[in-house]
Amino acid sequence: MPTVRPTMIHLAMALALGGASCAALADGVTRDGAAFQGRQASISTNADGSFRLAYDGGTRDIATQPWKTTTASPLFDGLFAMAQADLAADSVKAISDPGFDHGQPIACDCFVTGEKWPFVWTRDLSFSVDLGLWRFDPQRARNSFAFKVSGVRQPGAGDGTYVMQDTGSGGSWPISTDRVVWFVGAQHLLSDRAFAARYDKALADTLAQDRVYAFDSRLGLYRGETSFLDWREQTYPAWTKEDVTFIAQSFALSTNVLHYQALRIAASRLHDGNDYAGQAAALKAAINRRFWRDDRGMYMSYIGGDVEPAPFDTYDMLGLALAIDSGVADQARAKKILANYPVWPAGTPVIWPERRDQPIYHNRSIWPFVSAYALRAARRADAPAHIEHEIRSLMQGAALSGSNMENFELVSQKIHVDEGPLSGPVVDSPRQLWSVGAYMGLVVEGVFGLEPDDTIAPKLPVGLARDLFGDKESITLDTGTRRIVLHKPNGMEGNLLVTDRRKISGSTTDIWLKATTVTDVPLRKDAPLYAPDAPDAPEVTDKGGSDSVLLPPGGVLYVNGVRAKATTLPHRDTAQCVSVTIEERGLESLHSPTRCLGTVQTLPGEGPWTFTPSHKGPLQLRVSYENDNGPVNTGVTAAVRRAQMQCEGAAVQTEVIVMAHGIRRQVSTPARFDVPAHGSCTISLKPGFNMSYLAQFAHYTQAKGGASGPLDAARVFGASVMPLP
């Protein structure tokens, strides 16, 4: 029989009886259990060092593991063992997915993404490893990363080595462009020379390719979808469900911070004549200039529009945490972000505000891996209340569900809430790899302070420390080859425990802690849950010489990405692109669809198109097309073209356009050119590059562009050009 404390016996009996007698337990995490909104969990330690977790879903026996913690909290120690057990289950000899090799196993000593996701996905793997999995099985991590990098199979498309952007919105890259997260995760594994050589080759080639196809030199930002938040209408306006062109031409905080991190890595590793350090510095400045909102004290999740990017009153914790951890946000902004981004008793939402009309998945949810990045950000900002909040949220979620789950509903921290069509989380996998990485990061870095560079810098909130130390004088992390021992201070008068002195003896590092008082960042608990619903496209009436825009109650008009006070717009030849939001309860909705007013020249046919521009100066090109080579939500066959404009007496200008998968005829992303003088111009479309060109996508069998061969195609019906202000 396992050895169980008397209090644990009572709790385990109550759980077995349905939990009725435990209703009086306070919500939260204790040393040996957790309770929240009537659900409870308890853990007991057996004589052999193994654990038994009892929770509403049953019991789970957890074997002893290679890495061990010794604290006064059986829950803390047992959940660390559970994370390692989950990692072992995610360590496989073969991977599979219905969309690849017809669902047949593909040999790979790899990590799978989770119980319900038995494949290797670029961003999931990369964030998981970056959070700490690289320490536990580095060779398996390298194998997994190697599966997500590829050469080129398309003749004439070069011989580069590129990171794969997984199947995704509108046909993948360059609509989604966060594949550079691969470098953030894989940077921890470069002690292997062969792996490091391929890493450097892929780094140089991928950054060069993204500079051509995703970088907007005028704004200084990279285009593309938010990292991780890739279920379009969950976080973008609902009208992007069937047309992702807006997403393709928009700019996301998280994706730009990941590019910043990749450029910083390149600056430290590559010596090929490119000024990566200068590019990184310029990108950091552009992020701070374009995404920061002083009125909110946070960076926006994304910005976008047809002429100039409009602000969107929406925020996501992954992007914010990455900005803090990477140094894009200085210490003052880091503290403002943590003070202004709201939390709920169960944890921190991945987006805010939530969408009233969307089911629970990214919307209205807690994702443990995002909470782990929030924990890392809180440590960078010396914010003990936030450090403790994230740690307790991660422990509570794992304990109450008996595994490191993919996600939780925000208010209840349940793995399913029944709300009819809004029920969710829509998908929720046990032993989700990045949730496993999150818990391991919580222990190794979040509590014991072991940083990626192997420095040890614990920052323990006093309230949490009392649970972990109890009557013990020290707590220990034992990796099998290294021991970290944290010694309790004589007093805990402050709010944060940090290093006082240290001693290294062989493989053991002793850290004596001291209590200090830092200026804490309070948890924001007063935020409204939902954003206002976004309005329909604006109604515009031609008044003869001017256009009148009808606003709904609470409506706010934007013209070319800027708030406009007047709703009557004098006719102009140059573009006036209008959208509307709703302000309510101090929040602003997402934008309506946009309507553009102005003089349009229509150019019929497939091109090339020769025309005489009506104005000199900036001009916008859009192409009318159909691309039904895959569904809107996935695939690898976004059509990509390099649009070239040659005007009389002027140099050739080249810009990239993207023609995403769609369900009807639609328009491409815009290309912006400068007309130097009046005269004839010719626009032609040249071949580009998409993910179907990568050799590794020969495994893809769900749709076109995979096993059937590379495909970068769309039916072009014509183009339009409009002068810009």
Protein language model annotation of sequence segments:
Residues P552-T574:
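Recognizes extended acidic, P/S/T-rich segments that occur
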Residues T519-P552, G586-T602:
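Pro/Thr/Ser/Gly-rich low-complexity, intrinsically disordered linker/stalk tracts
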Residues H271, D275-S301, R333-R482:
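Non-catalytic carbohydrate-binding regions of carbohydrate-active enzymes
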Residues T70-F119, N143-S172, F215-S250, A285-W367, ...:
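Extended glycan-interaction surfaces of carbohydrate-active proteins
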Residues H10-A20:
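Bacterial N-terminal signal peptides
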Residues L25-P118, A194, R198-K201, D205-V212, ...:
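Acidic/polar, glycine-enriched structural segments that form the non-catalytic walls/loops
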Residues G561, H571-C577, T581-P725:
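Extracytoplasmic
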Residues P118-T226, A252-Y260, S365-A378, P384-R392, ...:
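Aromatic-rich carbohydrate-recognition surfaces in CAZymes
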